[in-house]
Curated annotation (Swiss-Prot):
A Gene Ontology molecular function term of the record: mannitol-1-phosphate 5-dehydrogenase activity
Protein name in the entry: Mannitol-1-phosphate 5-dehydrogenase
Lineage of producing organism: Bacteria, Bacillati, Bacillota, Bacilli, Bacillales
NCBIfam families the UniProt entry points to: PRK02318.1-2, PRK02318.1-3, PRK02318.2-1, PRK02318.2-5
Keyword list, A-Z: NAD, Oxidoreductase
Superkingdom classification of source: Bacteria
PROSITE patterns, sorted: MANNITOL_DHGENASE
GTP-binding recorded as keyword: no
Species this chain originates from: Bacillus velezensis (strain DSM 23117 / BGSC 10A6 / LMG 26770 / FZB42)
Length: 373
């Protein structure tokens, strides 16, 4: 069975590619990085290291790769032959690979079910990809594709930091991972995917991850940056920052438990586990990397403002929002743009236009108060 995976980066190799290999698939990576493609074809394997005290390693292979930018005919053949297609390319790249997937599906002659799963840090990634792919198909072609091809949405969670190794194929990942897939979106039967969790309702898992992992990571990074700390581990080790993060996750937890029926005790354990992941001494993650793209992360439905709008007293979340508004890292284009908008329009207008926090909302005043403290 062939698994075609778009994206041979650290997440593709260290997370999704490894799980596909464990599930018995012959993994073929599709990427536009010719150096990475050539190395994978030369070595036919790579090393995954668990970032913990044991430094356990395993060899993933045999694997192969194609350059999807130049080996188009081979890509179309693989789309025809694949039992499953996955992606880990980043949300902004899904649109770029959609035309090639669409062309491959047009040429597909196999009547076997095929499932295409976007494993991205976004909500509804597979649905987004399906819409992008279908934009390149006629109505008749869409009907044919719908008969045998599924686009089940998924939620993924694993910290894979920026890293440098002597062996460019080696990748370090944290031991924890979560891959939750909406089983209602599959074409045909549920495929074998070892380590994945299948559910009829993905929403609780998506929001739990977004409002715990992503929220906690963001608050740690933004408040840590304001304190002049360099890494996530340093930031979460600071008593005052840890308190803000813990309080912020307690606030989001209040909403999650009420909205989705998670048991309070179990959610508290999940929350502590997430904070423990930030403390991993074997992962070096700069706060500037985690904090990047503040315009997106300050969006009305994203990790900070989204949960803050859903609870009565979002004091710690408001502190995180205030810290994000102060993020002025010069090497981040969005941070530069954010500070420009604040200078030109004022913080109140930015809260309304970027964050969707209107003047009449209590959160508006709470954030301004935090900024003035």
């Amino acid at each position: 069975m062939i698994a075609l995976h778009f994206g041979a980066g650290n997440i593709g190799r260290g997370f999704i590619g490894a799980l596909l290999h464990h599930s018995g698939y012959d993994v073929v990576f599709a990427d536009v990085n010719e150096t990475m493609v050539s190395l994978l074809n030369e070595k036919k394997e790579y090393t995954v290291e668990l970032a913990d005290g044991g430094r356990q390693t395993e060899i993933i292979g045999p694997v192969s790769a194609i350059n999807s930018a130049v080996q188009e005919q081979k890509l179309y053949r693989l789309i025809n032959e694949a039992a499953i297609i996955t992606t880990a390319v980043g949300p902004n790249v899904l649109r770029l690979i959609a035309p090639s997937i669409a062309e491959g599906l047009k040429r597909r002659t196999s009547s076997e079910p095929l499932n295409i799963i976007a494993c991205e840090n976004m909500i509804g990634g597979s649905s987004f990809l399906k819409k992008a792919v279908f934009g390149h198909l006629t109505e008749a072609e869409r009907e044919l594709v719908n008969r045998t091809v599924g686009f089940p949405d998924s939620a993924v969670d694993r910290i894979v930091p920026i890293q440098h190794h002597e062996d460019p194929l080696k990748v370090s990942v944290e031991p924890f991972f979560e891959w939750v897939i909406d089983r209602t979106g599959f074409a045909g039967g549920q495929p074998v995917l070892k380590g994945a969790l299948f559910t009829d309702d993905l929403t609780p898992f998506i929001e739990r991850k977004l409002f715990t992992v992503n929220t906690g990571h963001a608050v740690t990074a933004y408040v840590g940056y304001q304190r002049g700390l360099k890494t996530v581990k340093e930031a979460i080790g600071h008593p005052e920052i840890r308190r803000v993060v813990y309080d912020a996750l307690s606030e989001t937890g209040e909403y999650l438990v009420k909205a989705y029926g998670f048991k309070q005790s179990e959610h508290e354990q999940y929350m502590k586990k997430i904070i423990g992941r930030f403390e991993n001494e074997y992962i070096t993650d700069d706060v500037t990397r985690v904090a990047r793209s503040p315009l997106r992360k300050l969006g009305a439905n994203d990790r900070l403002v989204g949960p803050a709008k859903k609870i009565k007293e979002p004091n710690a979340l408001a502190e995180g929002i205030a810290a994000a508004l102060r993020f002025d890292y010069q090497d981040d284009p969005e941070a530069v743009e954010l500070q420009k908008l604040i200078a030109e329009k004022g913080t109140s207008r930015v809260l309304q236009d970027i964050c969707g926090i209107q003047l009449h909302e209590p959160l508006h005043g709470i954030v301004l108060k935090k900024l003035n403290q």
